[in-house]
Design a protein with these regions (language model features):
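Substrate-binding pocket helix/loop in short-chain dehydrogenase/reductase
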Residues: 15-16, 20-25
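Conserved NAD(P)H cofactor-binding loop of Rossmann-fold oxidoreductase domains
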Residues: 7-13
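Conserved catalytic-site loops of classical short-chain dehydrogenases/reductases
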Residues: 2-3, 25, 53-61, 101-104
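Catalytic loop of short-chain dehydrogenase/reductase
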Residues: 47-98, 110
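C-terminal helical subdomain
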Residues: 98, 105-106, 122-187
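Short beta-loop-alpha junction of Rossmann-like oxidoreductase domains
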Residues: 14, 69-70, 101, 105-120
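A short, exposed helix-loop element centered on a Lys and neighboring polar residues
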Residues: 39-40, 90
């Protein structure tokens, strides 16, 4: 194993009174615990990859950490679960640095037109970007030197621009649309 992408996630954008403990446990289990468990399970193989010079990476699909209360108030449980993934990035990047394993987070600037989007009432897919933007950003990021590029919280379009891709219009569900819906956790 040279690359681990922790993308699995459970979502419930509900306030505290409307979040059953079963839903809370699901989000924490899939998002935070799942990221930790998968990373732990792959660690020996990732260390072997590093020893063989194969540039190992862990990429968590999780947001930049921000303690601004407006990200917590509407959906404390979901924010805690997603930030649990981001805290894995923060801790594992430092822990795994001596072994030459990169650990980074990647997050979309805008809403992405995926099946998960259908769980959010009232979101128009025409205001979103396609999943390909995240795939392309991940591809570029995972090619970077693991020893030099770790512990970062990156945004998809910034990664692409850093790699010379300036025209992002093709990633929009509706090309030419400049009114894209910002994703959660983007300040």
């Amino acid at each position: 194993i040279d690359i681990l992408i922790n993308n699995a996630s459970a979502i419930s954008l509900t306030p505290t009174p409307d979040t059953p403990m079963k839903r809370f446990d699901l989000m924490m289990g899939v998002n935070a615990r799942g990221t930790f468990c998968c990373t732990q399970a792959c660690l020996a193989a990732l260390r072997d990859s590093a020893a063989r010079g194969r540039n190992p990476h862990v990429l968590n699909i999780s947001p930049p950490l921000s303690l601004r209360d407006h990200w917590f108030a509407p959906h404390v449980a979901y924010t805690m679960a997603k930030y649990g993934m981001s805290m894995c990035t923060l801790g594992h990047a430092r822990e795994f640095r001596p072994w030459g394993i990169a650990v980074n987070s990647l997050w979309p600037r805008t809403a992405i037109a995926t099946a998960a989007l259908q769980m959010i009432p009232g979101v128009d897919p025409a205001l979103c970007r396609k999943p390909e933007i995240m795939a392309d950003a991940a591809w570029h990021l995972l090619r970077e030197d693991a020893r030099a590029s770790t512990g970062q919280f990156l945004i998809d379009d910034e990664v692409l621009m850093r790699h010379g891709i300036q025209d992002l219009d093709g990633y929009a569900v509706t090309p030419g649309n400049r009114r894209l819906l910002p994703d959660y956790f983007i300040d």
